[in-house]
């Protein structure tokens, strides 16, 4: 969307001499080749970058406020996927811990039964 801003249309892309810049060489055209109204919109000066960043910030805040842009939905999907992966990892970890505890209890129970059996067998 921002790339469209920098492309020249046939009416705006005319220089004083009548030449126009092609879209591929758009980046090499100088603002001195254009009249003053086009120079402010086409030159990549500090004010143009500030305007572009303000536009991007406003678009981002509008999308975050319920505008529902594609970039905001993809980033929210990415965050949702990360949260799911973290919860899945924690669930796997807790499941492994529960299984390890159960196995430990089972081994302890078997060892305790064996020891009690050996103690009882020695008494007879």
From Swiss-Prot:
Q: Which keywords label this protein? A: Cell membrane, Developmental protein, Glycoprotein, Membrane, Transmembrane, Transmembrane helix
The record lists glycosylation at 35, 38, 88
**Protein's cellular compartments:** Cell membrane
Q: Where is this region: Required for DVL/RTFL small polypeptide activity?
A: 92-124
Biased segments, Low complexity type: 71-91
GO CC annotation? plasma membrane
Transmembrane segments annotated in the record for this chain? 59-75
- A Pfam family per the record: DVL
State any GO BP term from the record.
shoot system development
The protein's matches in InterPro entries, at most eight in alphabetical order, are given as:
DVL, DVL_RTFL_regulatory
Region: Disordered; residue ranges are 1-25, 60-95
Q: How does it sit in the membrane?
A: Single-pass membrane protein
The highest taxon in the source lineage is Eukaryota
Query: Family per UniProt?
Result: Belongs to the DVL/RTFL small polypeptides family.
The protein's job, in short, is:
Small polypeptide acting as a regulatory molecule which coordinates cellular responses required for differentiation, growth and development, probably by restricting polar cell proliferation in lateral organs (e.g. leaves and petioles).
Name of the protein: Small polypeptide ROTUNDIFOLIA LIKE 3
Q: Which organism is it from?
A: Oryza sativa subsp. indica (Rice)
Native organism taxonomy: Eukaryota, Viridiplantae, Streptophyta, Embryophyta, Tracheophyta
Gene from which the chain derives? RTFL3
């Amino acid at each position: 969307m921002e790339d469209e801003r920098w492309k020249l249309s046939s009416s705006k892309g005319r220089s004083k001499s009548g030449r126009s810049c092609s879209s591929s060489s758009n980046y090499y055209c100088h603002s001195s080749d254009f009249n003053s109204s086009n120079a402010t919109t086409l030159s990549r000066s500090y004010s143009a970058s500030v305007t572009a960043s303000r536009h991007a910030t406003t678009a981002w805040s509008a999308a975050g406020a319920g505008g529902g842009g594609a970039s905001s939905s993809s980033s929210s999907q990415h965050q949702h996927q990360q949260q799911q992966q973290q919860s899945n990892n924690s669930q796997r970890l807790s499941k492994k811990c529960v299984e390890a505890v159960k196995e430990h209890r089972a081994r302890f129970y078997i060892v305790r039964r064996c020891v009690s059996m050996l103690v009882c067998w020695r008494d007879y």
